Amino acid sequence: MKTIQELVPLIHQWAKEREIYEQLIPFDELLKTHEEVVELIKACYDDDKPAIQDAIGDVMVTMINYCYMERIDVLEQINDVLNFEGKRSDSKVMLSLSIQDSLTRLMHANFRLLGIGGETPFLCFYEIITIIGYLDDIAFLENTTLEECLNIAYNEIKNRKGKIINGKFIKD
């Protein structure tokens, strides 16, 4: 199993090879994140551990891509979460819904930046850390880790081919 520190550059390379960073904008990646979060909510509601692990990994892949597009050090964000020792929630469904709330705020902040440019506001950093933290909490409740979930997602996509159509990567 690869570490998160090993997986992040591999995911960057995967996305570069598929021209995701060249052909999409950060908001496109947040829309993809939204799709993956909806799958996570459903998996948590169904209490489907394999689907939860897959969805956590998929959300992480899209967040890694978003952070790369916004020039945010995603490893720093992940390390901040993994080093936090606060109280964890005990409801996967509530945590997954909270991810959706944080993602909506991140999308709103990002949408305001479209056409404006400039520095990424603090709110974006806060919401990224919050989303990763909730993902880590759900993984913990499933007796797994972000690292294991990200490995599952990377192993699923690493050989995937496709193309960008209308602002979305479509797998072959």
Which residues does each PLM region occupy?
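Flexible "arm" and connector segments at domain edges
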Residues: 1-56, 60-172
